[in-house]
Every structure is written in structure tokens, then in C-alpha cells.
Regions:
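Conserved SGNH/GDSL esterase-like catalytic core that processes O-acyl groups on lipids
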Residues: 35-141
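Active-site flanking residues adjacent to catalytic metal/cofactor-binding acidic residues
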Residues: 70-72, 156, 194
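N-terminal secretory targeting modules
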Residues: 1-66, 235
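Short, structured coil segments at secondary-structure junctions
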Residues: 85-87, 149, 189
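A short helix->loop->beta-strand "cap" motif at the edges of active sites that frequently abuts
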Residues: 115, 148-152, 191
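Catalytic His-Asp segment of secreted/periplasmic serine-dependent ester chemistry enzymes
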Residues: 160-238
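Alpha-helical scaffolding segments of alpha/beta enzyme cores, especially the outer helices
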Residues: 137, 141-148, 177-184
């Protein structure tokens, strides 16, 4: 009797295994099943680098800040504290960031109560074909977040690119259109507009080669030119 019971259990298990294999074969095998499970996973909106940097920013407790630079890789790569050695400087650049990414993390910047905040964002919005209206709406929301802050806000124009080096993923015609909208937005929101663009273009309307290696990011001379313009912001008006 016991032997028959054992045989029945073995037979039942084998039947279930065979049935399972049959179902998998009809649905495309293990790979298909894995793809179905993978399809249920929510794709991350932000890169691991973005999330890591955001977490680090939010963990630090620096106060009495003079200047905060906010932006994408062009900001991220800058050693701004070396250009302003007598001031407390924070770099809040994250490589590949967009206006939406900055909006998602801007509360940490607001909470620092810095004397001055310099925002440079937009080239990745252009590169990833974000509509200008969406971009400007994000900029408005970023600035609105500072409504109760005493920080002086500087919206900086998007820098030109050098298409002969970088290619045509971003055109300067598009940059100019975005910058025109940025300038108007800064005026409407009563914040400073720091127009970097004219100081960085050559006679052909391209990012000066002496300021870049890859056609979009800045080298040492480029950062020196940028920070020199920032140093003169006390003379700019809203």
C-alpha cells in the first residue's frame, strides 16, 4: 500500500513538471517567461549616477554657502571652488541631467539658502528632443521653488556647441531659440539672466575651439572664461 502511494506521488509530480514544461514551450520557453517578468519591472527614470549624486547632495550639511552651481555635466566637471577660493562653493552638476532632473532635486539646493544660485541646464533637453514649452515650464517650476528664498537666482544661457567637433545632435540655432525663451522667462520671473553665449562663440557662431576638446564640454580656458563672467555678476541687472 505504501509503495503504491509513493508511486502515485512520483507520478503526480512528474505530471506537474511535464505540464509546466508544456506551458513554457507554448509561451516561448524560459526566456519568454523571463521577458514577461522583466516587462513588469518599472524602468528607472534616473541613472544610478544621478541617484548616487542626489543622495550625496542630500546627505551633506554645508551651510553659509556663497555660490551653488546647478546643471548637467558641463557644471559637474567644473572645479568652481578653485576659481573662488575665498568663498564656500557647492557644485550641484550631474552628468546628462535635464531640466526635469534638476526640478526633481532642486529642493536640496533651495534648502542651502545660498547667497547666489547659478543654473545652467538645457543642452540635454535639446539633445533628447524635449519640447521648448516643456523645458520652459520646468525652468519656471525650478525658479518658483525659490519663492520664499533669499537667494539671488541667475539663469544662465545655454552654451553653444562646436558642430565640426561634436556633430549635429545639438544645433546652435536650437540653442539660440531656447536661450531667447530663457531670457524672456527670467524677465517675467524677475530673476537675473546671465548671457554666456556671446562670449563663447567664434566668428562662425560656434563654440570656440580654444574652450573645448569635444565640442560641447569646456576645458580649463572655458571654465576660466565662465567664472570670469560669474565674477562680474554684481554689475548685471534683472
Amino acid at each position: 500500500m505504501e509503495k503504491r502511494k509513493n508511486l502515485f506521488m512520483v507520478s503526480l509530480v512528474l505530471s506537474l513538471v511535464i505540464f509546466g514544461l508544456f506551458v513554457l514551450s507554448k509561451r516561448g520557453g524560459n526566456g519568454s517567461l523571463k521577458r514577461e517578468f522583466d516587462g513588469l519591472e518599472v524602468s528607472p527614470t534616473y541613472s544610478s549616477y544621478y541617484l548616487q549624486k542626489k543622495d550625496i547632495f542630500e546627505t551633506t550639511e554645508t551651510s553659509y554657502v556663497d555660490k551653488i552651481f546647478v546643471g548637467d555635466s558641463i557644471t559637474d566637471h567644473g572645479e568652481f571652488h578653485e576659481f573662488f577660493p575665498d568663498q564656500v562653493i557647492l557644485n550641484r552638476g550631474i552628468s546628462k541631467d535635464t531640466s526635469a532632473g534638476v526640478l526633481n532635486r532642486i529642493h536640496e539646493v533651495v534648502g542651502r539658502n545660498a547667497k547666489e544660485v547659478y543654473l545652467l541646464i538645457g543642452v540635454n533637453d535639446i539633445r533628447t528632443k524635449v519640447e521648448q514649452a516643456v523645458y520652459i515650464d520646468n525652468i519656471r517650476k525650478i525658479i518658483d521653488t525659490f519663492a520664499n528664498s533669499k537667494s539671488e537666482i541667475y539663469i544662465q544661457s545655454i552654451l553653444p556647441v562646436n558642430n565640426s567637433i561634436y556633430g549635429n545632435k545639438v544645433t546652435n540655432d536650437k540653442v539660440i531659440l531656447f536661450n531667447t525663451a530663457l531670457k524672456q522667462t527670467a524677465k517675467e520671473l524677475n530673476v537675473h539672466f546671465l548671457d554666456l553665449f556671446p562670449s563663447f562663440i567664434d566668428q562662425n557662431g560656434q563654440l570656440k575651439k580654444e574652450y573645448t576638446l569635444d565640442g560641447i564640454h569646456l576645458n580649463g580656458k572655458g571654465y576660466k572664461a565662465w567664472t570670469d563672467l560669474v565674477s562680474g555678476t554684481h554689475t548685471t541687472s534683472k
